[in-house]
Amino acid sequence: MVKMSVARAFALGFVGVVISAGFARAQEDFPFEHELLLDAHPMKGSKRIPILTVEPDGTATIDLWCNSMQAQINVKGEAISISAGEKGSQSCAPERQQADDDLAAALVAVTSWRWDGENLLLIGPKTLRFRQQTN
């Protein structure tokens, strides 16, 4: 009876470790194919918040404060690099255009990423916090 209880406890413990390891691994994976919203308030007079969407092949669409931008993102472990591509030419208020330029510059300066709870941190000279969009 005692041997059976020890064996059962060991089996349950092993299953728990396997499930925990799988969950931890899932938490570490980069969130390809998810819309990631910049953790920021909309600018005055707008409801728009920047959104980052990255495909598994690294192509990305970044909706900035006014325009959108194409990019190529390379993820290797915790390292990440972002190469900016074409940016839209929609006319914007000067402060929104400046915010686009500032965010684009911060994104291309990112060198690593990690999860902080439910938030994705893109880390460079300036840390950018994104959260997965939930509907």
Could you tell me what each predicted segment is?
Residues 2-12, 20-135:
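Lipid interaction determinants
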